[in-house]
Design a protein with these regions (language model features):
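Short loop/turn microsegments at loop-to-beta-strand junctions
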Residues: 3-5, 199-200
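RNase H-like DDE/DDD metal-dependent nuclease/strand-transfer catalytic core used by mobile genetic elements
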Residues: 1-4, 10-118, 122-123, 214-218
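C-terminal, beta-rich DNA-binding module of retroviral/retroelements integrases
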Residues: 125-233
């Protein structure tokens, strides 16, 4: 079954890409965003829905592997509330236009479908004026980001008051040699920082982004890990 993933600039409505594929994966999404970022620069934030590979309602802060890659690039992931696509209304309206033009019905194969998508992107950006843009086209209004895409992930140093811990292959951090706090397998091999708030409460970050709290006083069983909470526990 063919699906399409698009990315667009909220302010100018400029449509960066519309890529057809049979299955949405982290690898495919990362490759497509890399092309976009290399050409147009990186934004300060990205607003998405909660579908894979962008978000997961079961994960801490809804973050996925793709979310953590965005964070490493200095991009803040922002999510619509579950079942509320209207919170990203501009993108949803564009998606409806694209679907009407390219997917009713879809082309006979992915290559032919991509030709349709490419034609839509060109027309949407360069030909079709938008009332919200004073009847200008997105291409006329859009400006490139001043933040270039880094070919290597920038290093990050936690403040000296943080306890820096490597996430294990199963997504946990070892605590006081014997105990475990589960975070997410999406962070395996990466380093998180834990800030001591006193009275056994720790605040956990990945780079400069808050993940959650845990109370070390609640860790009693060496065989059972505890999980982060969004509230102080």
């Amino acid at each position: 079954m063919q699906t399409t993933k698009e990315s667009a600039d909220s302010k100018s409505r400029f449509l960066f890409t519309a890529k057809g594929h049979y299955r949405e994966t982290f690898k495919a999404a990362k490759a497509e965003f890399t092309k976009v970022f290399r050409k147009y620069g990186i934004p300060h934030q990205i607003h998405t829905d909660n579908g894979s590979p962008f978000g997961s309602v079961r994960a801490i802060q809804r973050f996925t592997r793709l979310s953590y890659w965005f964070i490493e690039l200095g991009i803040t992931p922002v999510f619509s509330d579950p079942a509320h696509p209207e919170q990203n209304g501009r993108h949803e309206r564009m998606h409806r236009d694209l679907k009407a033009a390219c997917a009713k019905p879809s082309a006979y194969d992915l290559k032919a479908q991509q030709r349709r998508l490419n034609h839509f992107v060109k027309e949407y950006n360069h030909v079709r004026p938008h009332e919200a843009l004073d009847m200008e086209t997105p291409a006329f209004v859009h400006s490139f980001s001043t933040r270039p895409f880094p070919e290597r992930i920038p290093s990050f140093d936690y403040s000296s008051n943080f306890k820096v811990i490597k996430v294990t292959q199963n997504g946990s951090i070892r605590w006081k040699s014997y105990y475990w706090v589960y975070l997410t397998a999406a962070l395996k091999g990466k380093y998180v920082g834990a800030e001591d708030l006193g009275k056994g409460i720790w605040k956990v970050f990945y780079r400069n982004v808050f993940l959650g709290f845990f109370n070390e006083n609640n860790i009693r069983d060496k065989q059972v890990s505890i999980r982060l909470s969004q509230n102080i526990v």
